[in-house]
Amino acid sequence: MASSDERKSGLLVAYDVMAVPGRAINLVADLLKEGFLAPSPLGGEVLFFEHEGRMLGRTLTGGDGRAMVPFTPRAVGRVTVTVRVGESRRVTAQETTAGVFVWDRKRPIVIISMKALVSAPRRPDLGLPLPRSGAKPQNTDGGAVQALTVLAKRAHLIYVTASDRLELSEVRQWADRNRLPACPVFPLKPVPMSLSHELERWRREGWTNIRGG
């Protein structure tokens, strides 16, 4: 087998998902290689999807680098899924996690913009709230965190971010550090009406009680 120094360094991106008990959903992850202009997909690699050491499924990444495994949650709550690359001669990548948020559809859902939660900088900042340049992310506004904590007691929350999908893990870590309520994080594509398209998709999936925060 090739040594780790000879293998490509890949990046796993796993996506949060909303679900209801007893209904199948797809667990989705991408295996990518960062490029100068855009990430390139790594196809033909085995990805393992696990929960607390139990195998949920495994499958090959397609030509687009994406792998999907069907999963049916049984009870309301949060399921943390770990995704990792199987033994490979070509690729090495750090494992990552995503959440399956199993909810009751009767409860309202409120969309929260991650960017709106960031404290205003003392000087102009032309970058995104969570740049990949290594700059330290700003903290959240303390009052916003308190308000979200109260809101989360009577509604489900979903976070949307304009950050690139490659930054999802960093965004989740940032949310944890700032003690935001644990909720799914969805990246928006850098295209016009991206949030509207996501809303349409969620409503087609049966999430009809979503509104903006």
Where are these regions (language model features)?
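Beta-strand-rich domain onsets/edges
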Residues: 1-26, 100-104
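Beta-strand-rich structural segments
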Residues: 19-39, 47, 83
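Short amphipathic beta-strand segments in non-cytosolic proteins
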Residues: 46-57
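Glycine-centered loop-to-beta-strand initiation motif
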Residues: 60-73, 77
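Short, aromatic- and glycine-rich surface loops/edge beta-strands on solvent-exposed regions
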Residues: 75-89
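Edge beta-strands of extracellular beta-sandwich domains
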Residues: 90-101
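Asp-based phosphoryl-transfer active-site loop
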Residues: 108-125
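C-terminal cap/substrate-recognition subdomain and adjoining C-terminal extension
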Residues: 129, 133, 141, 158, ...
